[in-house]
Amino acid sequence: MLKIRPDRNIGSNIQKARYGKGLTQDETIAKLQLMGIEISRSTYAKIETNRINIRVSELIALSKIFDVDFNYFFEDLTL
């Protein structure tokens, strides 16, 4: 049976999308909060560095903020 590796690339893909929009973490968090997603700076930083998992609702909001397809965050994931 294959072991599933942590979703290491999701955080990296989030960071790439944020850079692509020219946003800082603080600006991204402010936009998330305007959409009703309560998240702290430390939590967001942990998501981008793959130390904690992200909620689906947060991914959906980020896809709208960064104007990317939801599937973008799952590119280059490996088992």
Question: Can you annotate each of these PLM segments?
Answer:
Residues 18, 29, 33, 63:
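The alpha-helix within a helix-turn-helix
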Residues 23-46:
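Short alpha-helical DNA-recognition segment
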Residues 14, 25, 41, 56-59:
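Helix-turn-helix DNA-binding elements, focusing on the entry/boundary residues of the two helices
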Residues 1-21:
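A short, Lys/Arg-rich alpha-helix, primarily the initiator
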